[in-house]
Design a protein with these regions (language model features):
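Noncatalytic, beta-rich nucleic-acid-contacting surfaces in large DNA/RNA-processing enzymes
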Residues: 1-318
Length: 318
């Protein structure tokens, strides 16, 4: 099951949703009457329309953290070495990976960096700087960009800077190769919309000595994210990571405030004290998607366990 908190499925008035997919209540939303498609949206996106109306929980969390700590989120230096260290170890948090289910990174609770797929990207790409994180954000949001494409190229020895991650990468690369700007833009538009390459575009690429592997990579892409969008996601997530390192008490308080239903938080906190489940990634061979801690309740227990490992407690009544 896949639940998108801002994805609205649109169907005609005279149609029953059950004709296409079963529906169910989403997690703990029974009392609110909010239903979700039972199937992952990728199983139905060929015959259903979805409109993304995204919330801004992360921004709200940053505002609240700024109020509680007195540290303005906009004045945080996101190039702090301790923040980048979260993508290679838990040392900056003062705990070992064994204390949090053999999870090697300090990204628990940082939503942009803690999805199963992004964790797989960290393991595969070993990011060294913010630019790498922006590229990885694009890979995690694109379609046909990583599995069977960029992942194979990375395994062959290429780096994140070499492969296609964002739509901007294509236009800039083609211009550097000497292609006319208009042609470069048109090819970028074809590829980022999943339209592949027509014979004319392929010839234009050969004319400026674009290697065959690059052309083949373009043909596999279904959708490409814009770099600026990914830079925004990454920027906010890094600011949240700052609070996790330097203001842990406030971080966990705000995290549970925005990510846990008050009706269940007592049970989650109690469970976490005796929680020994390892953080493991499972790959669905049919789709290439990674899962395990995508389950919201499991994620809450992971975060609570990490909080206790750092010697921090949280009183839900506050």
């Amino acid at each position: 099951m896949e639940v998108h908190p801002g994805g609205f499925i649109i169907i005609p008035d005279d149609m029953d949703i059950n004709t296409v997919t079963p529906v169910q209540y989403a997690f703990d939303e029974v009392s609110k009457g909010i239903k979700s498609t039972h199937f992952d949206f990728h199983d139905t996106d060929a015959n259903l329309l979805m409109i993304d109306i995204l919330g801004h929980t992360l921004q709200s969390m940053l505002v609240k953290l700024g109020e509680l700590t007195g540290t303005d989120p906009l004045k945080i230096r996101i190039d702090d070495p301790k923040i980048m260290s979260l993508f290679s170890s838990t040392e900056a948090l003062g705990i070992s990976k064994e204390q949090i289910g053999d999870f090697s990174f300090g990204t628990l609770g940082i939503r942009e960096f803690f999805s199963p797929f992004f964790t797989h990207l960290i393991q595969s790409c070993r990011p060294q700087n913010i630019s790498d994180l922006i590229r990885m954000s694009a890979l995690s949001h694109g379609t046909g960009v990583w599995k069977g494409n960029g992942e194979d190229l990375i395994r062959e020895g290429m780096t994140l800077k070499d492969i296609i991650c964002t739509r901007d990468d294509i236009m800039r690369y083609l211009i550097r190769q000497g292609m006319d700007r208009i042609k470069a833009f048109e090819i970028m538009e074809m590829v980022r919309k999943g339209k592949g390459l027509n014979p004319g575009a392929e010839q234009d690429m050969r004319n400026v000595n674009v290697p065959e592997w690059y052309t083949e990579s373009c043909k596999k892409i279904g959708y490409l994210f814009p770099q600026a969008h990914c830079a925004g996601y990454t920027d906010f997530a890094l600011r949240l990571a700052y609070y996790k390192i330097y203001h842990p008490q406030e971080f966990y308080k705000v995290w549970f405030m925005y990510n846990c239903n008050i009706e269940y938080i007592e049970k989650i906190l109690q469970d976490a004290k005796h929680f020994h489940k390892k953080v493991v990634l499972y790959e669905d061979e049919s789709t290439g998607y990674y899962s395990s801690f995508v389950d919201v309740y499991l994620e809450q227990r992971y975060v609570a366990r990490e909080m206790y490992a750092r010697g921090i407690s949280y009183d839900p009544s506050e």
